């Protein structure tokens, strides 16, 4: 008697859009605002990965005239982990003087997107003290922005894994990036943000695969790295250094955690060699420490 008749269910009101998507890591699987007809090979949809940022360096057009006209030169990818903090690979930003971060970008050749991109200047960067540009150990950096980005349908933050948590082998994750050297008209390679789905590869398997390459049979995979990919024809060279590798959060459809940062690869997914990524979970303590050190709460990217 204490059961409701099945023909009279209680249906809760649908959650409002805002409420549903509080917190980090929400991917817009169908894009934002408009549908792309004929989804071309590997193109991300507009706003699909709202944490994806482009890192630009500002250079004078003419070296002899440093105060003259300036160019935004594309350096690599990164991810927004807080409205004012970007996570990226150290080897792209270690030597650059003036950096700018662009969030909410999608097609670099047009400004017709329904939600605009947002640019911020980098006022402070933290490079891991053990970063080694020879072998790329600890290839991780944080960029702190002059002003927070405004959260928008095409601009959001990604979640980070709890400390030392590694994505399980076989998990299917996404790497994304533009893979091009310049923004705008001079740009070569990709104009529209690309994505590639890659499986996480177990560390030992990865090390064995890498030993078959020119790295040789004594190669040791350093603890600051993880691996993904190695499926023929799914080529991760498209991703750019510094770009995020995001994996689905179990039991939360549409929500993602950044397990890796694109670091390096041998060849291009030919002969099943996985790509190598910075292991974010392994460096979570370092990230929290540097973020908190600048008075920012790590709770934003914690799920």
Swiss-Prot record:
Its main location: secreted. The keyword Disulfide bond applies. Residues 1-24 are annotated as: Disordered. Keywords: Disulfide bond, Secreted. The keyword Secreted applies. Disulfide bonds join 173-247, 206-227, 237-268. GO terms for cellular component: extracellular region. PROSITE patterns: TRYPSIN_DOM. PANTHER family: LP15124P-RELATED, SERINE PROTEASE-RELATED. Binds and activates processed prophenoloxidases PPO1 and PPO2 and thus is involved in the activation of the prophenoloxidase cascade probably following the recognition of pathogen-derived products. Binds the A.niger cell wall component alpha-1,3-glucan, a fungal pathogen-associated molecular pattern (PAMP) that activates the host immune response. Heterodimer. This is Phenoloxidase-activating factor 2. It comes from Galleria mellonella (Greater wax moth).
